[in-house]
Amino acid sequence: MQYRTLGNTGLKVSEIGFGGEWMDGTLEETIAVTRACEDAGINIIDCWMPDPTRRSNLGDALQELGSRERWIIQGHLGSTWQGEQYVRTRDLDQVKPAFEDLLQRFHTDYMDLGMIHYVDKVEEFEQIMAGPFWGYVQELKQTGTIRHVGLSTHNPAVAKL
């Protein structure tokens, strides 16, 4: 596996990452996939999905394998589970418990990367940076609950900001 330094974080991440979106089967299946990723040298996992089954499977797999410290985990802020479905939101009354749930299900007190989830409009980026959502992100960073801050987007204009 080849590794690269991720931006200005100093983190060495594998060129191939583990997107855990499809880990909604059994815990045994998730453990097998996670172990295969580890054996291949993959060391970064992205957990954008708020579904409790996926989060629990991934967190329990890392705990079972004793490998939390070997992984760089991207946890998303703004990805929530409401009424049995995914909802993207900036409402802190929903964002905070969703992020706390992520930490709990991963059996950890920190995320290596706190990803501001799915920002595809420049106007939305500006609102986030000027509002309470950004304040919450800064608070998490200051307390060490997230080690580095990132942003997920599908828009090159937002990525360049």
Tell what function each PLM region has.
Residues M1-G75, Y136, Q142:
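N-terminal binding-site loop/beta-alpha segment at the start of enzyme catalytic domains
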Residues I16-E29, L77-K96, V122-E126:
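Active-site mouth loops of central-metabolism enzymes
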Residues G19, C47, E84, E100-L103:
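Generic anion/oxyanion-binding catalytic loop in active/binding sites
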Residues E21, W48-P50, H76-T80, I116-V119, ...:
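Active-site beta-loop-alpha junctions enriched in small/polar residues
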Residues E29-I31, L58, W71, Y86, ...:
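A generic "cationic amphipathic patch" detector
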Residues D39, V87-L161:
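Glycine/proline-rich, positively charged
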